[in-house]
From Swiss-Prot:
Designated name of the protein: UPF0102 protein amb4503
GO MF annotation: an example: nucleic acid binding
Transmembrane spans: none
Top-level taxon of the source organism: Bacteria
Cystine crosslinks: none
Family: Belongs to the UPF0102 family.
SUPFAM superfamilies the record matches: Restriction endonuclease-like
Length: 129
């Protein structure tokens, strides 16, 4: 079964997302973080997880969700519980493959991107329930 090609609107949204992720990575680098991974995906199906950026500063590993919307308020409100679970699954899979990070603290951050605004980094945006 062939799926239809993505619409132009979908392609444009993907491009905007990639630009936002690039800006977020740059912003985090300026704050002293190193980027360990971008566009991290783990697994398939219902157990799949994904996270936009994995960043490290010292003994801290941050799994970062990047949200780009018309306003920063819309961006922060756009993270769903389902998306959080996918990020948490990807984080667990990443850490399982990287035993050298076992002694690091782990945090879930967000970087919000909106037109004509500096990115906003929200450290410790949520904790695992």
């Amino acid at each position: 079964m062939n799926s239809a090609p993505p619409s132009r609107a979908h392609q444009a949204a993907q491009r905007r997302g990639k630009v936002a992720e690039g800006l977020a990575a740059l912003w985090l680098r300026l704050k002293g973080y190193g980027i360990l991974a971008k566009g991290l995906k783990s697994g398939r199906g219902s157990g799949a997880g994904e996270v936009d950026l994995v960043a490290r500063r010292g003994d801290l590993v941050a799994f970062v969700e990047v949200k780009s919307r018309a306003t920063l308020d819309q961006a922060i409100e756009s993270l769903t519980p389902f998306q959080r679970q996918r990020i948490e699954r990807a984080a667990a899979a990443f850490l399982a493959r990287r035993p050298e990070l076992a002694s690091c603290g782990v945090r879930f951050d967000m970087v919000l991107v909106a037109p004509w605004r500096l990115p906003r980094h929200i450290p410790d945006a949520w904790r695992i329930d």
